[in-house]
Amino acid sequence: MMNYTQVLEQTEQLKIGKKLPDTMKLCEKNDCNKIIYIPESYECDAIGELIEAILKEHKYNVGRFTTYALKNPLGQILYNKKPISQKDFAKYGEKLLTPNDTLFTKEELLLKLALDYFKDENADFLVLPCDTGCEAELFAEKLDSCAVSEKEKVCKELATTLILQKNIVLQEKTVERACQKCKYEGRFEILKKKPFYIADGADDEKSTKHLMAKLQYHYPNNPYIFIVGMAKDSYETVVKECALAAQQIITITPPEAPNAIPGIELAQEFSKLNPNITNASSIEEAVEIASILAEKDTVIAAFGTTVFLERYRQLLLKTNK
């Protein structure tokens, strides 16, 4: 019997692009016919969390799969807002890996694992994004489902309209309460003010564009300091999108990330477009440098790999106590 660590390690080794045309035949259709699909957008996980919160506040059991989790893959598979346990992750993962480990990409396996888990937990609703590296429709029957367009706004009205398509009676006060409780970690999350410390999961060209747009919208006249730790496969486009926007850029080597670009190399890339570059030896040093350079109205935005971002968040949250 495989344990959590073994399943996780084997899952991480699955290569994108290894999917076979008959993958779909290997998977039983999930029989939950209350599925809410959210097509690809920067805000798809935030929309999903808001929908989950409203349904949960109305006493429904909700399974949600996310494209993004700060801590580990357990955070991508949520049942009633709680991550799947290591025991269940190992149990469901082993069933999929043992006979079919060459037939799934990593994201396919995680999604199928989530759907099997939600089915056994008797979820009333599934909330699924469709930018997971494979189409959610491969593994779930789209009998009674609806989708959020990426052009629609992320707001209470959007989520409630979407849910009303399921003929669910919503209570206004309950919706308000759910929205007040809803908070999405690591997506333009303000951790501290004066100066402003922001954590964001931007780690590629598209998400970095969104981050820059949000900074310009909310803080158009504030100086920016960026703390950046990136993977090797996405840093070039990220550098082009954000280098000129910052007054100062601090690079780091993300911890526990074998595919990360070393901070010193990332600094060299940034320096081609912006001379105000510093490479820090740790997240703590990066935050200390930013704090020294910042004025009260400075916006310090950290973005990049998930492990680095979670360490940054925990450091800032700890100093707030």
Briefly describe each language-model feature range.
Residues 1-61:
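N-terminal leader/targeting and accessory segments in enzymes
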Residues 118-124, 218-222, 290-299:
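Glycine-rich phosphate-binding loop signature in dinucleotide/nucleotide-binding domains
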Residues 196-197, 239-299:
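C-terminal helical cap/extension that packs against the catalytic core
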Residues 306-321:
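Glycine/aspartate-rich loop-and-adjacent alpha/beta segment that forms the canonical ThDP
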Residues 51-57, 118, 270, 316:
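Hydrophobic alpha-helical packing residues
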Residues 34, 134-146, 151-248:
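Nucleotide phosphate-binding/pyrophosphate-handling subdomain across enzymes
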